[in-house]
Amino acid sequence: MDVFERTEQNFQHVCNSITRRIKQLPNYGGEKKKIAVREVENDIDEALKFISEMEKLAQNHPQRIKLQTKTKQYHSDIQKYKREVQLAQLQSSNQTNSNPWSNAPDDYQSQYDNQRQHLLQGSNMLDSTSDRLLRTHQISAQSEQIGQNILMDLGKQGEQIRGMRDKLHETDDQIKSARKIMTGIARRLATNKVILSIIILLLMGIIALIICLKWLR
């Protein structure tokens, strides 16, 4: 397990604590709810610190793009936790129709319901937008990864082509060297042939001269 994975494990532990505390918020009221909310907010701050640490670790990691996508998702999760805390603060302790304005006139009750409804709608819109942005980021990250893989493949192919070119240059040099050697051998053979012809002619001349001298005697 590397440093990123250990940090991620600590982050997940804090997220589990956040989820548990948020579920308990509607059961509290008054000062207890304020204390519970502060505890959740402290956990959220701690989770954000872990995310920041993971972002730094991801920059130099071999799987940088994959890990950066993870941290984006974790940021989105934290935003959802924050909205859930806001919603929980509006919910009643018994999760029914009671709320801080339950004994108030109808216009206050209606105002409370409208605010809660708007907050729920806004939360749903933010969740939907966050999901779309995350999917877009994932597609972008995948495209970037594919592009990097293609560049790596092209780089390897380029190295292979350069290696083949170098070998061709070496082969061409060897052919030129062999050609020079063969040309030298051919010249030596031609020279030797001329010398041999001259020697033969000289021998024939000497033999003819000896025969002539014998006839003259």
Swiss-Prot record:
Which cysteines bridge via disulfide bonds? none
Keywords in alphabetical order, please: Coiled coil, Cytoplasmic vesicle, Endoplasmic reticulum, Endosome, Membrane, Protein transport, Signal-anchor, Transmembrane, Transmembrane helix, Transport
Q: Which GO terms describe its biological process?
A: hypotonic response; intracellular protein transport; vesicle fusion; vesicle-mediated transport
Keyword Transport present in the record's keywords: the answer is: yes
Q: Where is the t-SNARE coiled-coil homology domain?
A: 123-185
| Ranges where the record places region Disordered | 90-109
Give the principal location in a single coarse category.
membrane
Known Gene3D superfamilies for this protein? 1.20.5.110, t-snare proteins
Q: Residue ranges, Cytoplasmic compartment? A: 1-192
Taxon lineage = Eukaryota, Amoebozoa, Evosea, Eumycetozoa, Dictyostelia
Protein purpose = V-SNARE that mediates vesicle transport pathways through interactions with t-SNAREs on the target membrane. These interactions are proposed to mediate aspects of the specificity of vesicle trafficking and to promote fusion of the lipid bilayers.
One Pfam entry for this protein is V-SNARE_C
GO MF terms here are: SNAP receptor activity; SNARE binding
Listed transmembrane segments: 193-213
On whether Glycoprotein is a keyword of this UniProt record, the answer is no
The record, for InterPro entries, names:
SNARE (IPR010989), T_SNARE_dom (IPR000727), v-SNARE_N_sf (IPR038407), Vesicle_trsprt_v-SNARE_N (IPR007705)
What is its subcellular localisation? Membrane; Cytoplasmic vesicle, Secretory vesicle membrane; Cytoplasmic vesicle, Clathrin-coated vesicle membrane; Endosome membrane
Outline the subunit composition.
Component of the SNARE complex composed of syn7A, syn8A, vamp7A and vti1A.
Q: Which CDD domains match?
A: SNARE_Vti1b (cd15890)
Topological domain, Vesicular: which ranges? 214-217
Q: Which GO terms describe its cellular component?
A: clathrin-coated vesicle membrane; contractile vacuole; endoplasmic reticulum membrane; endosome; endosome membrane; ER to Golgi transport vesicle membrane; Golgi apparatus; late endosome membrane
Q: Which organism is it from?
A: Dictyostelium discoideum
Descriptive protein name: Vesicle transport through interaction with t-SNAREs homolog 1A
